Amino acid sequence: MLTEQIIQSLRAVREQKPLVVNITNYVVMNNTANALLAIGASPIMAHSKQELAEMMSFSGALVINIGTLDSVWTPRMCFAVEQANANNKVVVLDPVGCGASTLRTETSREIARLADKLIIRGNASEIIALAGEQAQSKGVDALDSSDAALGAAQCLVAEYGANVVISGETDYVVTKDSVVTLNNGHPMMPYVTGMGCTLTALTGAFAAVGDESGLAAAAVLGVVGEISAESSRGPGSLQMNLLDELYQLDEETLIQRLKVQ
């Protein structure tokens, strides 16, 4: 049943080509825009408060990534969330580096409190810190294992009514009703900057067509990362191959490679 849901979501993204509004960081804008295009969605990077109400009126979802956060960005992000709420759109929050600084932690929590329909996508240390527990991180990199964040994820589900995607060697999708485990991916993936941010952007595309759990995006990127690594000499070629494999991914390959339970 889970596999069929994932396939249906992939089909819907490619048929509907949803517009995804991204307020994201300077490091990954190109990566995430290309990934959205490759999977079949339509990205737009919208950072001006003057256009956000209009953008959210006709977009499919809002992605907020705090990777290069500053005091100018926070009010825009909060305003965008309010507009997403007004239009009954899902907000996907990537709390990059949450726990590394007070600013990142407090801003992540403020955005999470504001959003009516929320998916949180982060690594284990970010999820643990967002839940108010003691996390182990080095900047934006996680030192905690993904399974160590399961309790924190369940706290976030309860506190914010969110669905939570924990990225790591094993990915977990946590909702109020279930915990789904994904065992795809490749050890080379963390050596490409913005891989988690790419997953967050893809989560926005799938949320726009009805997958408000985050499952389909995590499944697709895990399988694609695994396939891409097989023909990659290192992180540089992996990044390039990833876009090609997102574009080329067919349903039969996804069914054959997917490790979900």
UniProtKB/Swiss-Prot annotation:
EC number: 2.7.1.50
Residues given in the record as substrate binding sites: 45, 194
Keyword field: ATP-binding, Kinase, Magnesium, Metal-binding, Nucleotide-binding, Thiamine biosynthesis, Transferase
Cofactor(s) listed in the protein's UniProt record: Mg(2+)
Gene Ontology process terms (BP): thiamine biosynthetic process; thiamine diphosphate biosynthetic process
Top enzyme class: transferase
Catalysis performed (reactions): 5-(2-hydroxyethyl)-4-methylthiazole + ATP = 4-methyl-5-(2-phosphooxyethyl)-thiazole + ADP + H(+)
Primary role: Catalyzes the phosphorylation of the hydroxyl group of 4-methyl-5-beta-hydroxyethylthiazole (THZ).
Annotated family: Belongs to the Thz kinase family.
Protein name per the record: Hydroxyethylthiazole kinase
Organism: Vibrio atlanticus (strain LGP32) (Vibrio splendidus (strain Mel32))
